[in-house]
């Protein structure tokens, strides 16, 4: 019986180690996702700023391109 208790204790230690490793991997994955989200957010903001600049310069042309002409 003493052998089984020791084996169970070692198994518990292994499970704890595995749980710690999983938590570390989850934390790293979470950080990677945050970095990726920030980069994508910056990219989207950059594109939107560029669109705003173009619209400010060419607003009239932009609107005309969407106005239907007779029969279209």
Swiss-Prot record:
Q: Which family does it belong to?
A: Belongs to the prokaryotic ubiquitin-like protein family.
Answer yes or no on keyword Membrane. no
Mind giving the lineage of the organism this protein is from? Bacteria, Bacillati, Actinomycetota, Actinomycetes, Kitasatosporales
Q: Can the keyword Coiled coil be found in this entry's annotation?
A: yes
**Name of encoding gene:** pup
Purpose: Protein modifier that is covalently attached to lysine residues of substrate proteins, thereby targeting them for proteasomal degradation. The tagging system is termed pupylation.
The UniProt annotation puts the region (Disordered) at: 1-45
**Name the record gives this protein:** Prokaryotic ubiquitin-like protein Pup
Q: Which UniProt keywords apply?
A: Coiled coil, Isopeptide bond, Ubl conjugation pathway
Q: Which InterPro entries match?
A: Ubiquitin-like_Pup
